[in-house]
Amino acid sequence: MVGLTTLFWLGAIGMLVGTLAFAWAGRDAGSGERRYYVTLVGISGIAAVAYVVMALGVGWVPVAERTVFAPRYIDWILTTPLIVYFLGLLAGLDSREFGIVITLNTVVMLAGFAGAMVPGIERYALFGMGAVAFLGLVYYLVGPMTESASQRSSGIKSLYVRLRNLTVILWAIYPFIWLLGPPGVALLTPTVDVALIVYLDLVTKVGFGFIALDAAATLRAEHGESLAGVDTDAPAVAD
């Protein structure tokens, strides 16, 4: 049977492959588009470091009769705002709107981490707090952010909707794994818990990025447009 360490190494390798691919794809990006690639590199790069750390056995924190993998939550606290930031760039959010969605996202992650670290029944109250914040985040992703994205080109809007759907659907699975796994009622073994999380992390980070790269290539080839929504043949404009 595959052990936890092996699963963590698989996650690290997958994230590293994604990081290298995103860095290579963005090597010639114009100034307006560069931040999209930097964000993708940050998402998978941070996750790669977290998985290496866990594979080395660092950050395995005993809580009651379970083990909390602290780097997992630190990874999420750092990378999920970057995913939301990327979506916000596509949607064309202003600074106030960015602040709202990133704050909601951070509350979700902090509540999940705190709940995992609490041995008693109070952890479910923290889980509930995170769930409420998650519903608020979904509302913004599906409502105001989608409306904002509709003001952009059809290609950018289509990419936003694809990435939004991927994010919302797969992120909605994480709370159930938390509840059914070691932090909750422990119906899932640690190995199953880790395997599911590794798979979801790879899809929501590396898969997310590859969808963005594919769409960027299509926009460039068919419309002469970049992720930043400008003509790729036009002079680059500083951010």
From Swiss-Prot:
User: Which UniProt key words apply to this protein?
Assistant: Cell membrane, Chromophore, Membrane, Photoreceptor protein, Receptor, Retinal protein, Sensory transduction, Transmembrane, Transmembrane helix
Segments on the Extracellular face: 1-3, 56-69, 118-121, 182-189
For this protein, the record's PROSITE patterns field holds: BACTERIAL_OPSIN_1, BACTERIAL_OPSIN_RET
How is the protein disposed in the membrane? Multi-pass membrane protein
Q: What does the record list as GO biological process?
A: phototransduction
Compartments where found: Cell membrane
GO MF annotations in UniProt? monoatomic ion channel activity; photoreceptor activity
N6-(retinylidene)lysine (modified residue): where? 205
User: Which Pfam families does its entry note?
Assistant: Bac_rhodopsin (PF01036)
Q: Which domain of life is it from?
A: Archaea
Subunit structure comment from the entry: Homodimer. Interacts with HTR-II.
What task does this protein carry out? Photophobic photoreceptor responsible for the negative phototaxis. Activates the sensory rhodopsin II transducer (HTR-II) in response to blue light.
- The name this protein goes by in its record: Sensory rhodopsin-2
Its organism's taxonomic lineage begins at:
Archaea, Methanobacteriati, Methanobacteriota, Stenosarchaea group, Halobacteria
Gene this protein is translated from: sop2
